[in-house]
Design a protein with these regions (language model features):
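Active-site-adjacent structural elements in enzyme catalytic cores
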Residues: 1-214
């Protein structure tokens, strides 16, 4: 690979071919550059973990085009997430749902859950559309190191260990997405990021009884 390529109809088609063939594509998201593989291909996930030097017990987040794709990944969607999807999607809020039993264990990290979000960034959604389904969205970094915020940084980090770097300009960096889950029927914050957990609580509080909070 000679370097990052601009996002065009042709490069998106090429990226989709790579992903469908089990390859790895770096692409921009609303926070950092991410690494996309087909989340349903175990071999592609193995390669993703090798590229990132990622510990095997850490799950991988997934981007979807909208709630209609949740059934491909989640065994069920907690009712507490309904107002959150309406208020914060598309946006940097990852919802951790019970995972379908047939998902690769590399994706879930044997947690029994899967984290999903819908990106507001056009380039990310164009890639999902070109690939025809959800994509992994783990940050473009070596495990434990800062993520890439530009295509040039992603290329410098990975070079030929990824198959394509899509250049969508600089990403904001800073905090990652906020992760929320439900435990014993109660909303919980697994990682606070761009979206304040207080705003998440307020959203659900305005639609339901306050008891679901922890």
């Amino acid at each position: 690979m000679s370097g990052p390529v601009a996002i065009t109809a042709a490069s998106l088609r090429r990226a989709a071919e790579i992903v469908r063939g089990g390859g790895v594509v770096a692409f921009p998201t609303e926070t950092y550059y991410g690494l996309a593989v087909d989340p349903f291909q175990p071999a592609a996930l193995e390669r993703l973990f090798a590229v990132k030097r990622r510990p095997a017990d850490l799950p991988i987040l997934v981007l979807v085009s909208g709630p209609e794709q949740l059934g491909l990944l989640a065994a069920g969607v907690p009712s507490l997430f309904t107002p959150l999807m309406r208020s914060f999607w598309p946006g940097p809020l990852t919802l951790v749902c019970p995972a379908r039993a047939d998902l690769p264990t590399r994706l879930t990290g044997n947690t029994g859950t899967v984290g999903v979000r819908r990106s507001p960034l056009a380039a990310a959604n164009q890639l999902i559309a070109a690939c025809g389904g959800p994509l992994t969205a783990t940050s473009a970094n070596l495990s434990g190191q800062p993520p890439a915020v530009t295509a040039a940084e992603a290329f410098a980090l990975f070079g030929d260990s990824v198959d394509l770097v899509l250049d969508g300009g600089a990403t904001p960096g800073g905090q990652g997405s906020t992760l929320v889950g439900v435990r014993a029927g109660r909303l919980c914050c697994l990682r606070e990021g761009v979206v304040p957990f207080a705003a998440v609580q307020a959203c659900v509080f305005s639609c339901a009884d306050p008891s679901p909070f922890s």
